[in-house]
Amino acid sequence: MEQEPQNGEPAEIKIIREAYKKAFLFVNKGLNTDELGQKEEAKNYYKQGIGHLLRGISISSKESEHTGPGWESARQMQQKMKETLQNVRTRLEILEKGLATSLQNDLQEVPKLYPEFPPKDMCEKLPEPQSFSSAPQHAEVNGNTSTPSAGAVAAPASLSLPSQSCPAEAPPAYTPQAAEGHYTVSYGTDSGEFSSVGEEFYRNHSQPPPLETLGLDADELILIPNGVQIFFVNPAGEVSAPSYPGYLRIVRFLDNSLDTVLNRPPGFLQVCDWLYPLVPDRSPVLKCTAGAYMFPDTMLQAAGCFVGVVLSSELPEDDRELFEDLLRQMSDLRLQANWNRAEEENEFQIPGRTRPSSDQLKEASGTDVKQLDQGNKDVRHKGKRGKRAKDTSSEEVNLSHIVPCEPVPEEKPKELPEWSEKVAHNILSGASWVSWGLVKGAEITGKAIQKGASKLRERIQPEEKPVEVSPAVTKGLYIAKQATGGAAKVSQFLVDGVCTVANCVGKELAPHVKKHGSKLVPESLKKDKDGKSPLDGAMVVAASSVQGFSTVWQGLECAAKCIVNNVSAETVQTVRYKYGYNAGEATHHAVDSAVNVGVTAYNINNIGIKAMVKKTATQTGHTLLEDYQIVDNSQRENQEGAANVNVRGEKDEQTKEVKEAKKKDK
């Protein structure tokens, strides 16, 4: 009888967690023994794992009272167990049918070119063409006859000699139904072979599975959704036809501590249903001069089998460079330096060094992942793109040029309603005029303050003896000024940091908001009867409003600085004129301290959590509107220049007045 845990966790959650741990323990053992070729032991482990998976899934966790983080974690474990159960059952069915064992045994034999079919009436219905009677003799491959053909064999394990009832020179025979172990998705006609399912069938079957199915710590480094083909090379040297263009991705595991426990590589390459483990400086990869990447076929566990990966020439250059860079980091990538056609065999030659034998190439495909050229130094890519050898034959064909790839549709410029552009330009123009008016008004106000202060000082009678201010008071005010100034700088630094974080978060959130927000917008707003988008027009107006508000806000800041500087300077001058230089200096420190306190209070108000959320939302909106902004910064630059000139002029005047006051006091 199962006991309740001390922390009050329900017994059902404990059962699910125990079933989860035991199930994956047996599944991992089954995977390890399966990779070692111990099929019977692997089946026993798989069956035990399925039992624990069924036990964990059988417990209901969807009742209304099952709430809280514990039940949420349990539901996630059950979902993962369901996905694992499907995969384990599929693998167990394959093992029980003996497909994997038969495939491995058949590969030990030399594959033939054409399938062996019952001789029915095919030879009588298809008379031998005259052109085949004079065909050249066939080349011998390991003692068996084979015909040189452009088409190749996708499943060499099921190949055998042609029927003796047909001449040896006859073309391959076709049957209305697929032979045992094969599937057909096409049918023959008088004009050629046609697919019976269409392009959608292949596209739907070439989509990458979810990343979560590979592991919780799986990290996808690159994903090419389409335009990648693979072909297979058997031990006899025969090459299969390229597969239908599919996806490619490279995945690495973040938790390296589990690699030895689960007996898994640090990462792997996946091209459709084919997987290749990637171990830095150990997994051999050869880039051919013909444009293909060659890998040992480790999934078949048979020596001499290779897989070629071909990238379409229509793929972006950045994807190709990233793919090569990742291979360089995660495998033992090498270049085919020369293609020797004179001897009619493909040799991977390194200029100035001896050539590796074919036995060395075959040994590289074993489980120990030996190096391709034993005894030689590595020939690796240097820089971003490796250069092709100078003596490469000009007759070589780049295989990537024949791989079809879906073209990327060009983005058409959005058609905006006429009213949106007019309103946007009017908003920007009005904001520019308002900002200019604020700066100009502040300049006039500053001059008026200066005139008023001068007239006030003319009516004031200075004290006969300057007021003596205690040095302690002066020093205290000076220290207060320095302290408040430092606080203002620190608070400003913190505000800048908060703004930087908010900007980064806002930029990351903007694409998601735009993606999911567009789903909530009715189609009537996305496009009207004239083909124009009212929503885009409204976004342009909103972006212009943000630009206009920013322009007006900058004008307000410039105007406020001008007025505060003028008021502060004239106040200090008036006190200095009336009570002497020492009193004026003390007043100057006090006014600066008051200004610093105000700035610090304003900055602290913008550091809190609410301010952070507000800034993040604001930056998200700004990022969304970046594509709709209309650049019009000429007037803004003029306003800032005028404000800066005005502030500099005021500071010069203040400096002159301070010097004059010091002379009078002396």
Swiss-Prot record:
Known tissue expression: Ubiquitously expressed, with highest levels of expression detected in adipose tissue.
Segments for region (Required for localization to lipid droplets): 431-503
Region: Ubiquitin-binding region (UBR) domain, residue numbers: 190-380
Comp. bias intervals (Basic residues): 379-388
Residues of the MIT domain: 16-94
UniProt biased composition (Basic and acidic residues): 648-666
Consequence of changing F24D: Abolishes interaction with IST1. Does not localize to the midbody
Gene3D superfamilies assigned: Phosphotransferase system, lactose/cellobiose-type IIA subunit (1.20.58.80)
Covalent S-S links between cysteines: none
Pfam family of the protein (one): Senescence
Keyword terms, alphabetized: Acetylation, Cytoplasm, Disease variant, Hereditary spastic paraplegia, Isopeptide bond, Lipid degradation, Lipid droplet, Lipid metabolism, Lipid transport, Lipid-binding, Neurodegeneration, Phosphoprotein, Transport, Ubl conjugation
KW Lipid metabolism (keyword) present: yes
Disease: Spastic paraplegia 20, autosomal recessive: A form of spastic paraplegia, a neurodegenerative disorder characterized by a slow, gradual, progressive weakness and spasticity of the lower limbs. Rate of progression and the severity of symptoms are quite variable. Initial symptoms may include difficulty with balance, weakness and stiffness in the legs, muscle spasms, and dragging the toes when walking. In some forms of the disorder, bladder symptoms (such as incontinence) may appear, or the weakness and stiffness may spread to other parts of the body.
This protein's name: Spartin
Protein species of origin: Homo sapiens
Gene designation per UniProt: SPART
